[in-house]
């Protein structure tokens, strides 16, 4: 009886997985089981870090706004600024406020003085 060659399905699946891991180093780009483990781990990390990125940027914006507001030598804090913004119904989010704080501090000082009075 002649020998039957294996099909292409498993090879195609492994090739697809190897293409995903082609930029990895060492066994993580060569051994199929290790590639599969690393692929799962990398997808988990990317999913987790997409949420983490939003948290990190929000913290950065808050820190920048707070630093500029407190650097004005006025007894005024970030929480009071945000509270007054909401009270006055000004639609400035933290990202925009942080950009204003870095690029044009005088504008932020004007905004804070306007909403305080």
UniProtKB/Swiss-Prot annotation:
The protein's matches in Pfam families, at most eight in alphabetical order, are given as: Ribosomal_L20 (PF00453)
- GO MF annotation terms: rRNA binding; structural constituent of ribosome
Q: Which domain of life is it from?
A: Eukaryota
Q: Entry's SUPFAM superfamilies?
A: Ribosomal protein L20
PANTHER family named among the record's database cross-references? 39S RIBOSOMAL PROTEIN L20
Function of the molecule = Binds directly to 23S ribosomal RNA and is necessary for the in vitro assembly process of the 50S ribosomal subunit. It is not involved in the protein synthesizing functions of that subunit.
Protein name per UniProt:
Large ribosomal subunit protein bL20c
Q: Which organism is it from?
A: Eucalyptus globulus subsp. globulus (Tasmanian blue gum)
**Originating gene:** rpl20
């Amino acid at each position: 009886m002649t020998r039957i060659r294996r099909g292409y399905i498993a090879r195609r699946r492994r090739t697809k997985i190897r293409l995903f891991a082609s930029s990895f180093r060492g066994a993580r780009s060569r051994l199929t089981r290790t590639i599969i483990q690393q692929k799962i781990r990398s997808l988990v990390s990317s999913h987790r870090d997409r949420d983490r990125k939003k948290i990190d940027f929000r913290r950065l914006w808050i820190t920048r706004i707070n630093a500029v507001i407190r650097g004005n030598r006025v007894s005024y804090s970030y929480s009071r600024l945000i509270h007054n913004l909401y009270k006055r119904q000004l639609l400035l989010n933290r990202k925009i406020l942080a950009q204003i704080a870095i690029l044009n501090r005088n504008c932020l000082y004007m905004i804070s003085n306007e909403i305080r009075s």
